[in-house]
């Protein structure tokens, strides 16, 4: 089965204000809130599109400079991650992290 877009993750400065905005402006619902070692996260959905709002506590684990905002990553769901990685690399893409177990951040 082909990979499917699962979510778009945004780095934000004020996670609660941003979640409030997406609720009020687009009718999205908060589906989960999580505090990990390096970031707070709020997951939102309108039933079709999913957003992951990320507010990092510092630069550790974020991959971006402190205070940076914008698209952090796109999350895809697939049935066979090692096979998908090979397909991505064959198409000219690259992985920035090794495959492993999900971390405490909820990913």
Which residue stretches match the model-derived regions?
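Vicinal oxygen chelate
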Residues: 1, 4-13, 42-45, 63-107
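Core segments of cupin and vicinal oxygen chelate
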Residues: 2, 9-51, 103-105
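A short, local hydrophobic-aromatic micro-motif
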Residues: 6, 31, 72, 96-97
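Short acidic, gly/pro-rich beta-turn/loop elements at beta-sheet edges
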Residues: 20, 52-54, 63, 85-86
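Short secondary-structure boundary micro-motifs
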Residues: 26-29, 58-60, 77, 94-97
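A short, acidic/glycine-rich surface segment
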Residues: 39, 53, 58-64, 97-98, ...
């Amino acid at each position: 089965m082909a990979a499917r877009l699962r979510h778009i993750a945004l780095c934000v400065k004020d996670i609660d204000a941003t979640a409030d905005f997406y609720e009020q402006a687009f009718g999205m619902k908060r589906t989960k809130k999580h505090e990990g070692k390096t970031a707070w996260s709020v997951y939102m959905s309108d039933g079709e599109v999913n957003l992951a709002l990320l507010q990092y506590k510092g630069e550790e684990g974020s991959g971006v400079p402190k205070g940076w905002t914008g698209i952090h990553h796109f999350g895809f769901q697939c049935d066979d991650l090692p096979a998908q990685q090979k397909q991505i690399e064959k198409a000219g893409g690259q992985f920035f992290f090794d495959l492993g177990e999900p971390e405490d951040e909820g990913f």
